Curated annotation (Swiss-Prot):
NCBIfam families: PRK08061.1. Part of the 30S ribosomal subunit. Contacts proteins S3 and S10. This is Small ribosomal subunit protein uS14. Its cofactor is Zn(2+). The gene is rpsZ. It comes from Brevibacillus brevis (strain 47 / JCM 6285 / NBRC 100599). It holds the Pfam family Ribosomal_S14. It comes from the Bacteria. Binds 1 zinc ion per subunit.
């Protein structure tokens, strides 16, 4: 779980555009965030396995 202070700090508009970064909307993790879903890889995997993300299914080949 991310620190609440860092989550609040990230929500503010940065002084410079390059300082902006993505965070998982579910847990607040700053790394490995899928932009399309706004979720980190861990949360994405959990929700995908439960079938809570529409249009996403486990790949098999």
């Amino acid at each position: 779980m991310a620190k609440k202070s860092m989550i609040i700090k990230q929500q503010r508009e940065p002084k410079f555009a390059v300082r902006a970064y993505t965070r998982c909307e579910r847990c607040g993790r700053p790394h490995s965030v899928l932009r399309k879903f706004k979720l980190c890889r861990i949360c994405f995997r959990e929700l995908a396995y439960k079938g809570q993300i529409p249009g996403v299914k486990k790949a098999s080949w």
